[in-house]
Amino acid sequence: MYVSRLLLFLAPLLVKGQLSGSVGPLTSVSSKSQTKTCNVLDYGAVADKSTDIGPALSSAWDECADGGVVYIPPGDYAIETWVKLSGGKACAIQLDGIIYRTGTDGGNMIMIEHTSDFEFFSSTSKGAFQGYGYEFHAKGSSDGPRILRLYDVSDFSVHDVALVDSPLFHFSMDTCSNGEVYNMAIRGGNMGGLDGIDVWSTNVWIHDVEVTNKDECVTVKSPSKNILVENIYCNWSGGCAMGSLGTDTDISDIVYRNVYTWKSNQMYMVKSNGGSGTVSNLVLENFIGHGNAYSLDIDSAWSSMSTIEGDGVELKNVTIRNWKGTEADGSQRGPIKVKCASGAPCTDVTVEDFAMWTESGDEQTYVCENAFGDGFCLADGDGTSTFTTTLTASAAPSGYSAPSMDADLETAFGTDSEIPIPTIPTSFYPGATPYSALAGASVSSSQVPAASSSAEAKFVASPATSSPTATSTAISSVDPVSAATTTATSHGHGKSHHKHQCRAHRH
């Protein structure tokens, strides 16, 4: 079976909320390329940063969609007309060049739909999209295209590419299944509407990704099930989130683990305002934050969202575990806010090993409303009553100190000048080794399209507080194919204890 296919053994023992089955392509890029390789240069593409690559990319896809590799060699390409690449099986797009937006239409620059056994990657880890979103944003416009969208794609991976300065969203996965996304850098402007990764899908593993923007970092939307998000670096971003949630919300079995958030809107937010449906079996563990406006922010009356008809979205069986670090101003925006609707209270919520402290002032607040469970301002009960509780802490909890990342940005990227294409990092969370080495780590400069950098990883069933151990076999695309084997284990952080001096006010 293909080496980039993630095999899940001991399935009955897997922790609830993790993946429900295998993820990733079914066949290797090496095998696909032996079937056929469609070099876009042979279909009219020119690496001159001005000739539209759109028609050549579409033609190459038509030739290789039923088995093969569409190869975009190193070089600078322009894209003026967007491409919708539909159908196909056992196919891949190997982006080793850089594609620069020159068109101005809305929509999606690249859309992949109704496809299975698919891989989108750079074998050098240097492939990128430059969206030049600042050309829209500097004029005050929030219009323009998105960069990459996958719709109804199964058994897939996206990795080792950078998505930069999209006029709108950078990357979305809509109604996809059995996917793996990793080793990516996403860099957008400092304004809303420039989402990093949005996913509403089933059985998807997103890991080892850095996002800079001012909106969603990695966000789960409805409907979604069995989404595992790990080793995420929100580096001056909007922060990770769930939502916005509306009518008939259906989200379950979601795990976020090892999330580092710096100078962002929040460390994690669940946002809704009215609506209906359920979010169940949510785990948020091993979070580190510094300088963020909000930390844990569950808000069922989010004022930035128009009110939707319904009693609210019900949250149940939610665990928040092992959060450390500091928030910008704990008296204005305390590190815990769990505000649930009276008609749809939150139940079975647990907050444990949570130690954060304010960077400004000498006190912070914890606010809970109609939220039932164990920890801090949560109330005992089954959700049949209503309440609001505010706790004020005037002493720092023990164990709140947490490491920072060397690559923390000193300032955000603006909206009126070009944003540089970054190098994909090799660290995404303090002390955690990425599950797969960068594809370009063992690739020579004499690059040819021959094989993938994807990796075989076998999950070992583990407690929810631990990250799975992955054994990765990286395959370079040098001809002849060569392999390098690395073993990577993601390390969790130990538990911390906290003591608070609090004043409680219940209404």
Swiss-Prot record:
The keyword Secreted applies. Its EC number is 3.2.1.171. Residues 1-21 form the signal peptide. It is found in: Secreted. It is an enzyme of class 3 (hydrolase). Coiled coil: none annotated. InterPro entries: Glyco_hydro_28 (IPR000743), Pectin_lyas_fold (IPR012334), Pectin_lyase_fold/virulence (IPR011050), RHGA/B-epi-like_pectate_lyase (IPR024535). This is Rhamnogalacturonase A. GO terms for molecular function: polygalacturonase activity; rhamnogalacturonan alpha-L-rhamnopyranosyl-(1->4)-alpha-D-galactopyranosyluronide lyase activity.
